[in-house]
Amino acid sequence: DNIEALKKLNLPVVRKVIISNFIEEINKLVVVEETPILSIFLKKASDIKPFQCSVNTINLRKTILNKVPYSNELEKNFLIFLDHVNDVEAFIKNETRTMNLKIPYVDHAGFLRNYIPDFVVKTPDLMLIVETKGRIDIDVAAKDAQTRRWAQMVSAKTNKNWEFLRVNQSDFDGGGYNSIRDFLILASKQKH
């Protein structure tokens, strides 16, 4: 009788449920939500050291970098958009050589990972953490939720308004956006 029970416990679907439950319970014990360390904001964009870049770059006006790296056409087109709209004062491409903003999150398999959002954008009344997204993968919801929590905690700690904004390629390619505020309005409609 015990042999039959062990065989059933070894079925792939049962093993998956058991492992998933163990990961969830272990994460409750070891993953602790922390207030973000704000040393990143003590770093001035003007302190960024020159670096060589092996990816494509573009020259823009509203950024401290003389050439801004981009990974794909969506990023390039969004950079051009940021540089031309009136409600963006400044922006920077976030990567390890620039702002190095990393937000920890727990992925779909229960592993702790670091998420590096695409851009930090300054508007007259708020700071934005912006992610451009061509394809929605399995961890996007977890990254979005953690980045929203991060923005709320940083807002409370700095008395500056921080928000997270994900710009999907399908929305961006649809056009008709004349400001970053247009994307914030769209994002708030999509939440409800």
Which residues are covered by each model-predicted region?
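Intrinsically disordered, low-complexity, repeat-rich regions
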Residues: 1-116, 122-128, 132-192
